[in-house]
A protein has these predicted regions:
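Solvent-exposed, non-transmembrane regions of membrane-associated and secreted proteins
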Residues: 27-222
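N-terminal Sec-pathway targeting helices
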Residues: 2-26
Length: 222
């Protein structure tokens, strides 16, 4: 009987140690996940990159990111204020920052099928959906009624020259949509008609002019 009790105590001790190691392991995993999330947030919130932003006179400092940078996007009164990159394919900048380093927050980037000077009738820009309105996480606000009316201006710099943006529609679409996600196969008229018919919100006061271009900002929905 005494031997049995010792065996039980021994097993209890082993079980306690196993549970301790399991909980310690889970705790360490939790710490790493928190640290990893912090690093992702820090990368997406790196305001030091703003020193490479052109000013309204078209003057920008020497940019180590200029090789793959095709523009700069700013949406007024939001946190969207980022360089626009373009890769050889649409996977290149999913997890790469504008300096070419690995980053889970990735970069804001132009569809690889579009021309880099934004001369296409319709261009498509992607960005990760991040918390705290970082990257294209701020686009969530446009799903609220009335938000578009008060936050419909922005600027896109192309070759350091500023062009005014007017946001006129908000919508949701499947990633397989052949009009929205095939930028080089649709002209501005076709895209505009589709958007008008399917948008959640559409500003009827905005009229397309002859040389106007359409630019879509796309992010995932969670």
């Amino acid at each position: 009987m005494e031997t049995l009790k010792k065996t039980i105590r021994c097993l209890d001790s082993i079980t306690d140690k196993i549970l301790f190691f399991i909980f310690l392991f889970l705790f360490l995993i939790g710490l790493y996940a928190m640290y990893d999330s912090f690093l992702v947030y820090q990368a997406a919130n790196d305001t030091s990159i703003l020193k490479y932003k052109p000013d309204y006179e078209g003057i920008a400092p020497d940019k180590p990111i200029k090789g793959n940078m095709v523009g700069w996007l700013t949406i007024d009164d939001t946190k969207i204020d980022y360089p626009i990159m373009q890769g050889e394919d649409n996977n290149e900048y999913l997890n790469k920052d504008p300096f070419g380093d690995y980053s889970l927050s990735g970069s804001i980037f132009l569809d690889s099928r579009n021309t880099s000077d934004f001369s296409d009738d319709y261009s498509l820009i992607y960005g990760h959906h991040m918390e705290n309105d970082l990257m294209f996480g701020a686009l969530d606000h446009y799903l609220k009624k009335g938000y578009l009316e008060k936050h419909n201006k922005g600027t896109i710099y192309i070759d350091d020259v500023p062009y005014e943006l007017t946001l006129f529609a908000v919508g949701e679409s499947e990633a397989t949509n052949e009009i929205i996600f095939a930028p080089t196969f649709a002209d501005a008229g076709t895209v505009c008609s589709y958007i008008k018919q399917n948008a959640l919100y559409f500003d009827e006061s905005v009229k397309m002019q002859e040389n106007d271009k359409i630019i879509a900002l796309s992010t995932c929905k969670y």
